[in-house]
Amino acid sequence: MLLQAFIFLLAGFAAKISALMTNETSDRPLVHFTPNKGWMNDPNGLWYDAKEGKWHLYFQYNPNDTVWGLPLFWGHATSNDLTHWQDEPVAIAPKRNDSGAYSGSMVIDHNNTSEFFNDTVDPRQRCVAIWTYNTPESEEQYISYSLDGGYTFTEYQKNPVLAANSTQFRDPKVFWYEPSQKWIMTAAKSQDYKIEIYSSDDLKSWKLESAFANEGFLGYQYECPGLIEVPTEQDPSKSHWVMFISINPGAPAGGSFNQYFVGSFNGTHFEAYDNQSRVVDFGKDYYALQTFFNTDPTYGSALGIAWASNWEYSAFVPTNPWRSSMSLVRKFSLNTEYQANPETELINLKAEPILNISNAGPWLHFASNSTLTKANSFSVDLSNSTGTLEFELVYAVNTTQSVSKSVFSDLSLWFKGLEDPEEYLRMGFEASASSFFLDRGNSKVKFVKENPYFTNRMSVNNQPFKSENDLSYYKVYGLLDQNILELYFNDGDVVSTNTYFMTTGNALGSVNMTTGVDNLFYIDKFQVREVK
């Protein structure tokens, strides 16, 4: 216990000292959480403190290096608005230097089913963390409880609460299932391709109920499962159950990604409606999605956040003294009328970014209500940009316009560096492919130029959200935050998250719109503004 306390104190001290260094790196994201220093990966233990009005985010954390390594801790951050985060001292530490406090979740034990609490702890703050203790010999599920609202934790003396004689059994995600008055856990038998479902009365004794196995993309292993009831967009009083599973390695685009299944849950078994794997985010940098145990109802009931990186290259990204960021928090719903193609409707996960900003520049409108030609490109300079921008674009394709398939029929946006315009992001839509593309390779940063896994070009299929008067309309919202880009198509029916890296200090702030064809694209609205 003395060694554990010493490690805990060292990590907390390092986190506090590094707070002084936060502003030394000019390209740190403004509205995506990053640790003050050290390595970060999976989000863990997400919950909302209804007493204090505060959100809690824990995460896999190595304070001693900028690459993954043991011992691995639970880092901690808090927020009042889900956008601006305050780094907190380490919350959970492993017992040994060759071990890790691996991923897990948090619950609020309002009714004290665990008997860890007395009346001095507000029921809204009765936090119990369920996490994987990893050693070279095994992975076992532990619980720890907090008596101070989630800042420090005491380990349950009779841990582990669940073991399987395996080194590949991890990532417990726990929620309360009201109809049966039981706790439900999903945990990954990673290399058996199983998500096992357990139930418990007290968080201490667990019963295996069923397994969801060998479904969707298998890759190398399953990780970071989650099961949550998600309301429908058309009628929020109705809902379906969604099973999230992370895959690494083995993503179709390389490395790591998240898939999901839509179905029903009866308290013991999850049954997918069609067993078809669906993709949560089509970018390269969105992994280990976890949803919040509870929320402020004004934000909705299904909120989640993911690690904004990819295991293929995460150890090499050019940031210092930290490495990795989180995505924005997203509000999830299910679009039960998603038009996958002209003949098929599907149930589709919809994502809406949570972004609370009070200090932003004015929206700059240009090219709106105009038809693009090769001769009339549009541009705007945000000369004081710090590199965090958001934009909204609504455009239409003229379906009566005949264009040769051999012509690259693009609408392109160019976000160029203010100090060096030879560094830029190019993104846009190509009509023949009906896809939105991104080129993040136009950088002088060595990592971008030389790392073969950092895919420079990628695309996402897009379908119009409406068609009228021979025009097919598309919509995209984008947030560029220093070195991470989130794109939401047609109000979040499709999402793509990707990191990018420019020379330090070369903030993106010059925006150009061009096309390679005449009279094909109609711009209904385009606006951009700086986020400060």
Curated annotation (Swiss-Prot):
Transmembrane segments: none
KW Transcription regulation (keyword) present: no
Cross-referenced InterPro entries: ConA-like_dom_sf (IPR013320), Glyco_hydro_32 (IPR001362), Glyco_hydro_32_AS (IPR018053), Glyco_hydro_32_C (IPR013189), Glyco_hydro_32_N (IPR013148), Glyco_hydro_beta-prop_sf (IPR023296)
Single biological process term from Gene Ontology: sucrose catabolic process to fructose-6-phosphate and glucose-6-phosphate
PROSITE patterns named in the record: GLYCOSYL_HYDROL_F32
Residues the record lists as binding substrate: W39, M40, N41, D42, Q60, Y102, S103, R170, D171, E223, W311
Active site: D42
Catalytic activity entry: Hydrolysis of terminal non-reducing beta-D-fructofuranoside residues in beta-D-fructofuranosides
SMART domains xref list: Glyco_32
Coiled coil: none
Designated name of the protein: Invertase 4
Organism: Saccharomyces cerevisiae
Gene for this chain: SUC4
